[in-house]
């Protein structure tokens, strides 16, 4: 390499991680974390509490409810449930990060819903399908709360409408949400009813480069080499990006189940590295006969709602329209 050549791109440096000899990673940036607030002071958007749902794995959920609960005829109105899978870049930050806590608080308050945010385990310490397992544990736990008349979680038993449950995920969380929706079809969730799924900027991949990946190869938020590294650290050891966890389009047994999904909302932006794969995902759903609402905006990029408050409001409005 000549002295004038630019240095090779280091995806691990971009992600601010170091891979350890035992396969774990050191995350050099510690994302600010927020403790739950079950009894918030006046002016806060939502109350929140943490509940461990699997003592063997340590997986927990954080439940959010609006501070001001609506009422009907002097009784508290029942609120829809959103099972929320946060975007973490697979490997970077947990559900109790300040960004996700703020997102879920706003969702609970603005949409008047109960949010159950899943604190799934992170790769590479826990590779896929651990995250899918954790999400299913959370869904089955929510179902159990309504059938357990003695020990059910009070916020769910007292405030939730179990006939209106939605699965919602962002980025890799939308990937988890898709697999959770498919897995839910193998279980009797009665009396819990899944009324729809929201996939926000779903993260999928594959070995063959798409036009949007080539166009946005050096994207400052999601450069393709960094996304490749995320998949490398998240997928089961020994598989490539055409594995069904990353690239669901070619997996025929899964396609039959896709047609049994309820209505879906898919949201994306033109500047997203994953745009083409998101649109292919919409085509997969449509071809299977799923009722799909696709909302793509040419202007925008991955995680734009974190830096543009107007886009955050627009996102909430799209979800509100879908669940109302």
From Swiss-Prot:
Catalytic activity of the protein: a carboxylic ester + H2O = an alcohol + a carboxylate + H(+)
Tissue spec. comment: Expressed in flowers.
Record's function text: Carboxylesterase acting on esters with varying acyl chain length.
Organism: Arabidopsis thaliana
Pfam families registered for this protein in UniProt: Abhydrolase_3 (PF07859)
Keyword Translocase assigned: no
Name of the gene this protein is made from: CXE9
UniProt motif Involved in the stabilization of the negatively charged intermediate by the formation of the oxyanion hole: location: 86-88
Segments forming a coiled coil: none
Molecular function as annotated in GO: carboxylesterase activity
Xref: InterPro entries: AB_hydrolase_3 (IPR013094), AB_hydrolase_fold (IPR029058), Carboxylest/Gibb_receptor (IPR050466)
Enzyme class: hydrolase
EC number of this enzyme: 3.1.1.1
Protein name: Probable carboxylesterase 9
Family assignment from sequence similarity: Belongs to the 'GDXG' lipolytic enzyme family.
Superkingdom classification of source: Eukaryota
Catalytic residues in the record: 171, 272, 302
Keywords annotated in UniProt: Hydrolase, Serine esterase
